[in-house]
Amino acid sequence: MAGPGPTFPLHRLVWANRHRELEAALHSHQHDIEQEDPRGRTPLELAVSLGNLESVRVLLRHNANVGKENRQGWAVLQEAVSTGDPEMVQLVLQYRDYQRATQRLAGIPELLNKLRQAPDFYVEMKWEFTSWVPLVSKMCPSDVYRVWKRGESLRVDTSLLGFEHMTWQRGRRSFIFKGQEAGALVMEVDHDRQVVHVETLGLTLQEPETLLAAMRPSEEHVASRLTSPIVSTHLDTRNVAFERNKCGIWGWRSEKMETVSGYEAKVYSATNVELVTRTRTEHLSDQDKSRSKAGKTPFQSFLGMAQQHSSHTGAPVQQAASPTNPTAISPEEYFDPNFSLESRNIGRPIEMSSKVQRFKATLWLSEEHPLSLGDQVTPIIDLMAISNAHFAKLRDFITLRLPPGFPVKIEIPLFHVLNARITFSNLCGCDEPLSSVWVPAPSSAVAASGNPFPCEVDPTVFEVPNGYSVLGMERNEPLRDEDDDLLQFAIQQSLLEAGTEAEQVTVWEALTNTRPGARPPPQATVYEEQLQLERALQESLQLSTEPRGPGSPPRTPPAPGPPSFEEQLRLALELSSREQEERERRGQQEEEDLQRILQLSLTEH
């Protein structure tokens, strides 16, 4: 039998799972570990698809890229989940988070160095999560990211930490980045616990074994992935086009202008923005598939989204086949670039559904705004995108070739039912003064520096607050895959109308429905009130659901049970539809009245 051929030597060793020879070949440093075979797979992607755990372990030890996607847009971790192997998923997930952490170590000093050249400033980024579904819109939160920049130092304050276990995670945190000659200092300040976690990021990774061990996922996390569909959501902006919005009627239509945060802005629509969601279920048991379908069908039928189901229908399974090579593809066939596999493939046969929905993103661009998107704002978004999935989506959008001007406001889709609206405001405290920021006198050196909006930032905002405990970075918070959790939460909330879960919606209303532009109470007081409100509601819900003992006082007979989810949804949609029709009728009536007035005014002259 012939040995490995001269082409794709690492891939051929992976195919045969000859992991000891693979280890030796990698130690020689003579082969490209990221080389793609004729089917577009790297050695790691091939090893995962074939389920060759020993080869996967060797490649990961040699730092094969876990974050790479194949030609179909699936990441290595998603392919690992499709194998259904818990050990494979645990290993790939651990190294994925480890590689993200090391990239963070290398990237932060470079981003801070970029910021050093830019003028100092303070700005607020207001994030509002909105929805066109009436019931979902009630639970959408909002948050204001407050950003201070001075030299190589950056501070970002937030109270909306993320989304986990079907709830929005809140807490008062500050993220402080301070550039240094040999790297950077990162501080995460937890104002609720008065604790500061400090991490020094050098140009070289310290104690990689310790960091790798800290990234090991729990068994519950692995089990959750293996019993849930694989979901991929991304914005397809390949055909995006920007158009000026118009206002007015008939021959008086003009390009739309709006004032945002005190700046005149041109309003653009980004068309042909497609939100693509693909779901794979080949790794699920029949019970898990039934549970998944039962949770999604009413909502999907309500949205009316175009959905396509596809499954592998390749050649019949042959006697010599294995579960990861069901059509018995030979290595000679696989590695021959001129041989067509047609519908045959390696790996478990794919069961996938896909949804495509077109959206319009909206931008408000001001050519008068003094901030620079590339020099001042993009590095900050890059920093926050390391640990925040929403900032990562914003970064992907603003890196497009935008029309001229600074985006003072952006509205982009995050999921099929959720949009994010980001507004930049209070530049250098011009709207609401802050003690930590001031505009220098005209005679000062800062004012004479040529900066179109000179600003001085108090250096003490980048220091550890008095009385706080300082700890090392004992824990890690890798970038969360929030998309699927958020989508499922939106589905759950969209089906609610009455009962205890409706009171949970009231919690979010109480937490987030603040009047824009109003001066808020002190942040600590507001947050404490939020916690007390949530605790009180949780206790009341528990009391309402606890079983009653024999000696308990009689309770008022319960009202008839609430209708089914489908019935709730139908009623909610009917109400929403009637309201929408009424709004359209009023708008049409106003338009007709205006046209009659204009016609009369023209005939009189």
Swiss-Prot record:
State a GO cellular component annotated for this protein. Answer: cytoplasm
Family matches, as Gene3D superfamilies = Ankyrin repeat-containing domain (1.25.40.20)
Biological process annotations from GO: negative regulation of receptor internalization
Q: Where are the ANK repeats?
A: 39-68, 72-101
According to the lineage, what is the superkingdom?
Eukaryota
Task: Recite the UniProt keywords alphabetically.
Answer: ANK repeat, Cell membrane, Endosome, Membrane, Phosphoprotein, Repeat
Matching Pfam families: Ank_2, ANKRD13_C
Q: Where in the cell is it found?
A: Cell membrane; Late endosome
Where is the region Disordered? 306-333, 541-605
Sites where Phosphothreonine occurs are at 556
Ranges of compositional bias, category Basic and acidic residues = 576-589
- Composition-biased stretches (Pro residues): 550-563
Q: Where is the composition biased (Polar residues)?
A: 319-328
Q: Tell me where it mainly resides.
A: membrane
Biased composition range(s): Low complexity: 564-575
Q: Which GO terms describe its molecular function?
A: ubiquitin-modified protein reader activity
Q: Which InterPro entries does this one have?
A: ANKRD13, ANKRD13_C, Ankyrin_rpt, Ankyrin_rpt-contain_sf, UIM_dom
Q: Which residues form the UIM domain?
A: 482-501, 528-547, 564-583, 589-605
Q: According to the UniProt record, list the residues that bear Phosphoserine.
A: 552
Q: How does it assemble?
A: Interacts with EGFR (ubiquitinated); the interaction is direct and may regulate EGFR internalization.
PANTHER family, alphabetized = ANKYRIN REPEAT DOMAIN-CONTAINING PROTEIN 13 (PTHR12447), ANKYRIN REPEAT DOMAIN-CONTAINING PROTEIN 13D (PTHR12447:SF2)
Q: What function does this protein fulfil?
A: Ubiquitin-binding protein that specifically recognizes and binds 'Lys-63'-linked ubiquitin. Does not bind 'Lys-48'-linked ubiquitin. Positively regulates the internalization of ligand-activated EGFR by binding to the Ub moiety of ubiquitinated EGFR at the cell membrane.
Q: What is the protein's name according to its record?
A: Ankyrin repeat domain-containing protein 13D
Q: What is the species of this protein?
A: Homo sapiens (Human)
